[in-house]
Amino acid sequence: MVDCAVSQFSYGKIEETRLKGRQLPVPGGYDSEGNLTTDPAKIEETWRVLPMGYWKGSGISIALDLIATVLTNANSVSKIGTFGDEVGLSQVMIAIDPCKFNSVELTDRIVDEILADIKASQPAETGGEVFYPGEIELNTRQENLANGIPVIDEVWQTILSLER
């Protein structure tokens, strides 16, 4: 399963990074002067986020937005933020069962080989680790199941204020 924003970082990840007082690991968008930045607060001022994969990512992003919007008759990404809250956005889920094409054992072996190849890649930083897409989130889920879900205090206070 691949679940990802078609921008370099999702809006949620940009907000989370800002709330944690951190910078993005690589540029994720533009500031108000048109400069690439890793500062999530400056990106939130413009919401000019980088697409994944630059020009190829732009093509994929446009194609997926067209498919999702046409199939759901919901709002295109161009409408994000125009209604205040993010409502009525188009979403499409595509599920493919690889076991309809191969045995479970073969599928698992192929996946394990590919993940091992990814994990064997040279990390960007000496002593760093290479993660496959979704691995960090999987690790976070396992930690949360074991230890509970940490909530940023500012977000928790907002949730509590909704009770009143």
Where are these regions (language model features)?
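Structural beta-strand/beta-sheet cores of well-ordered domains, especially the beta-sheet scaffolds
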Residues: 26, 48, 56, 90-94, ...
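Glycine-rich beta-alpha junction loops
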Residues: 6-9, 56, 98-100
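Catalytic-core signal marking the mid-to-C-terminal active-site face
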Residues: 71, 76-164
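A glycine-rich, aromatic-flanked flexible loop/lid motif
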Residues: 28-43, 58, 80-91
